[in-house]
C-alpha cells in the first residue's frame, strides 16, 4: 500500500431496492443525477452519475438478501488495500462475512460484512484508481456517513482497527448521549456514530448516507411529492448546516444535507 491509496475512504454507494425503475425515477428527479448502464455481466446494473462522475449504483435487491430479511437499503463501500486481508481481520474482530469475496471484472474485488453490532458495510479493492476524493463534497455528492448502533464506542474501535479511522470530535447530545465524529484524516470529519435510542424502530445498527443538495427545504418538499417520507427535519446542526432524514418510496433510508450558506 502506498500513502496515496485511500484506505478507509467511502468510494461507492449502492442502492439495492425492490423496484429499480421506480427508484431511478425518484432519485434522478430529487438529486439531478443522470444514469448509465453499469458493467455487471450477470444482472442489470445502473450507475448514478453526478456531472461527469459516477458516484454509485442501483440494482435489484438480491433474493438471498430478501430471504435474510434485508429491506431496500443503501450500501456504502470503503476502500481497502486487500479485501481478503480485511475480511480475515474483520472476522477476528467479531464481524461476519455476508457476501464474497468476489471479483468484478474491470472494477475490483469486493465483499460485504456485518459489523459486531449488526450494521452492514462493503469493502472494495479497486482494479485501478479508487473513486471518490477527500475534498469537500459538492452538490449531488455524498457528504456524511452516519452509524446508529448499540455501542458506538465498540463500533468505533472496530472501524478504527479495520480502516484506520480517527476520532475527530465528540459532541454531547444530552439525553441522546455522545455523537462521535470520525474521519480518515485528523481534523477532517466524514461522519458520526451514536447509540441508537432503544425505542427507535428499525434494525439495531445501520448506516445512513447524506446527499448534498442546494436547498434542503425545497428537496424535502420534493421527497414528499415524489412519494417518499421525511422522517426527521429539516433541522440545523451545530455547524450551521441543515439536514433531513428521509425514506424513499421503496423503503430505503437516506438523508439530505445543505451546507451553511456563506455569509
Language model features with spans:
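Short, low-complexity, polar/charged sequence segments that are solvent-exposed and flexible
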Residues: 32, 56, 76-78, 97, ...
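Ligand-binding pocket scaffold of soluble enzyme catalytic domains
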Residues: 14, 23, 31, 37-38, ...
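DNA polymerase sliding clamps and clamp-related checkpoint/processivity subunits
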Residues: 50, 54-62, 67, 76, ...
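N-terminal beta-strand motif that seeds the catalytic metal site of vicinal oxygen chelate
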Residues: 1-21, 73-78, 124-156, 162-168, ...
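Core segments of cupin and vicinal oxygen chelate
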Residues: 2-54, 92, 100-108, 147-189, ...
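Vicinal oxygen chelate
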Residues: 1-6, 9-18, 46-49, 64-89, 91-143, 168-186, ...
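Short loop/beta submotifs within extracellular cysteine-rich repeat domains
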Residues: 23, 33-35, 53-56, 66, ...
Amino acid at each position: 500500500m502506498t500513502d496515496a491509496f485511500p484506505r478507509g475512504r467511502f468510494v461507492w454507494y449502492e442502492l439495492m431496492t425492490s423496484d429499480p425503475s421506480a427508484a431511478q425515477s425518484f432519485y434522478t428527479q430529487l438529486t439531478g443525477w443522470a444514469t448509465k448502464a453499469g458493467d455487471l455481466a450477470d444482472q442489470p446494473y445502473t450507475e448514478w452519475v453526478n456531472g461527469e462522475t459516477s458516484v454509485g449504483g442501483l440494482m435489484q435487491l438480491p433474493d438471498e438478501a430478501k430471504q435474510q430479511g434485508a429491506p431496500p437499503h443503501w450500501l456504502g463501500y470503503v476502500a481497502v488495500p486487500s479485501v481478503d486481508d480485511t475480511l480475515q481481520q474483520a472476522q477476528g474482530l467479531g464481524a461476519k462475512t455476508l457476501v464474497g469475496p468476489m471479483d468484478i471484472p474491470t472494477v475490483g474485488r469486493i465483499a460485504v460484512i456485518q459489523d459486531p453490532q449488526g450494521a452492514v458495510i462493503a469493502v472494495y479493492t479497486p482494479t485501478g484508481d479508487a473513486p471518490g476524493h477527500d475534498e469537500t463534497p459538492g452538490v449531488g455528492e455524498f457528504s456524511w456517513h452516519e452509524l446508529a448502533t448499540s455501542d458506538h464506542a465498540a463500533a468505533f474501535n472496530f472501524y478504527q482497527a479495520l480502516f484506520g479511522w480517527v476520532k475527530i470530535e465528540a459532541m454531547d447530545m444530552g439525553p441522546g448521549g455522545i455523537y462521535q465524529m470520525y474521519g480518515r484524516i485528523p481534523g477532517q470529519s466524514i461522519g458520526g456514530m451514536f447509540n441508537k435510542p432503544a425505542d427507535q424502530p428499525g434494525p439495531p445498527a445501520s448506516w445512513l448516507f447524506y446527499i448534498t443538495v442546494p436547498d434542503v427545504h425545497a428537496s424535502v418538499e420534493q421527497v414528499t411529492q415524489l412519494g417518499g417520507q421525511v422522517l426527521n427535519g429539516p433541522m440545523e446542526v451545530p455547524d450551521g448546516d441543515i439536514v433531513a432524514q428521509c425514506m424513499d418510496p421503496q423503503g430505503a433510508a437516506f438523508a439530505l444535507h445543505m451546507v451553511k450558506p456563506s455569509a
